[in-house]
Curated annotation (Swiss-Prot):
Known function: Binds to 23S rRNA. Forms part of two intersubunit bridges in the 70S ribosome.
rRNA-binding among keywords: yes
CDD domains per record: Ribosomal_uL14
Protein name (database record): Large ribosomal subunit protein uL14
Cited PROSITE patterns: RIBOSOMAL_L14
Superkingdom, natural source: Bacteria
Organism whose genome encodes this protein: Pseudothermotoga lettingae (strain ATCC BAA-301 / DSM 14385 / NBRC 107922 / TMO)
SUPFAM superfamilies per record: Ribosomal protein L14
A GO term, aspect molecular function: large ribosomal subunit rRNA binding
Subunit text: Part of the 50S ribosomal subunit. Forms a cluster with proteins L3 and L19. In the 70S ribosome, L14 and L19 interact and together make contacts with the 16S rRNA in bridges B5 and B8.
Gene (name only): rplN
One matching Pfam family: Ribosomal_L14
Gene Ontology CC terms: cytosolic large ribosomal subunit
InterPro entries assigned: Ribosomal_uL14, Ribosomal_uL14_bac-type, Ribosomal_uL14_CS, Ribosomal_uL14_sf
Protein keywords: Ribonucleoprotein, Ribosomal protein, RNA-binding, rRNA-binding
Lineage, uppermost ranks: Bacteria, Thermotogati, Thermotogota, Thermotogae, Thermotogales
Length: 122
């Protein structure tokens, strides 16, 4: 359950480490984002000497949330942190690696490149 001003960890090697959500995409009054949603973020913490600058506005896909996500079979999945993967204007990941597990809902939303880079899909 990600909303405006939420902080996210970055789960890829794009160069950013922390993001702050500016807006959850997908509708005029959409308040909360969950796994698979696109968010517009400001970069708050970066790795030195990378292509990403602090304060840069980027788009990202949420891949993990602490809030449990209910699946159609009645099971729930939750993670230890809130994390996202940075994407470009073609919805492809900006990094070349993804760290940590990602939820299966990412595949259903059509982010196959992120699924192929992830070490584990839960």
């Amino acid at each position: 359950m990600i909303q405006n001003e939420s902080y996210l960890n970055v789960a890829d090697n794009s160069g950013a480490k922390k993001l702050r959500v500016i807006r959850v995409m997908g509708g005029f009054h959409k308040k909360y984002g969950t796994v698979g949603d696109i968010v517009v973020c400001s970069v708050r913490d970066v790795v030195p000497n990378t292509g990403i600058k602090k304060g840069e506005v980027v788009k990202a896909v949420i891949v993990r949330t602490k809030k449990p996500v209910r699946r159609p079979d009645g099971t729930y999945i939750r993670f230890d942190d809130n994390a996202a993967v940075l994407i470009d204007k073609f919805n492809e990941p900006r990094g070349t690696r993804v760290f940590g597990p990602v939820a299966r809902e990412i595949r259903e939303k059509g982010y196959m490149k992120i699924i192929s880079l992830a070490p584990e899909v839960l």
